[in-house]
């Protein structure tokens, strides 16, 4: 089995419930085991500011699904939970992104792993560090170094 990390985010239709439903759906994927999940964090939107705050988390899974099959399954879960893409970095009921898939580096028209720009996003790095404090990314970046830039993050840890 391959260890993968999934970022979860929502800012519409009761975001905490959206994340819980997504985690349940991920745990039910074939040949996949949900290992652990970070705390949930409330964060400001990355893009347009005329939208509600987000709730974000990171999940660690073990899977036998290929990266593209995992992507297909995550997009199916997004769609089942009412995901509509209206604008770039806009509001959404659910956003599921593959951050890491083993030590693989993948770049094609459908998928980029490690997830592009993840190292600059506090709502990814802080929860990822919480569940994988000894992680080394495929490009040799070390999570303990990446998280230092977010020592003064403004996210609020939730206890859902």
UniProtKB/Swiss-Prot annotation:
The keyword ATP-binding applies. GO terms for biological process: folic acid biosynthetic process; tetrahydrofolate biosynthetic process. Pathway: Cofactor biosynthesis; tetrahydrofolate biosynthesis; 2-amino-4-hydroxy-6-hydroxymethyl-7,8-dihydropteridine diphosphate from 7,8-dihydroneopterin triphosphate: step 4/4. It comes from the Bacteria. It catalyses: 6-hydroxymethyl-7,8-dihydropterin + ATP = (7,8-dihydropterin-6-yl)methyl diphosphate + AMP + H(+). GO terms for molecular function: 2-amino-4-hydroxy-6-hydroxymethyldihydropteridine diphosphokinase activity; ATP binding; kinase activity. Keywords: ATP-binding, Folate biosynthesis, Kinase, Nucleotide-binding, Transferase. The keyword Glycosyltransferase does not apply. Pfam families: HPPK. Its EC number is 2.7.6.3. Belongs to the HPPK family. Catalyzes the transfer of pyrophosphate from adenosine triphosphate (ATP) to 6-hydroxymethyl-7,8-dihydropterin, an enzymatic step in folate biosynthesis pathway. Monomer. This is 2-amino-4-hydroxy-6-hydroxymethyldihydropteridine pyrophosphokinase. The lineage of its organism: Bacteria, Pseudomonadati, Pseudomonadota, Gammaproteobacteria, Pasteurellales.
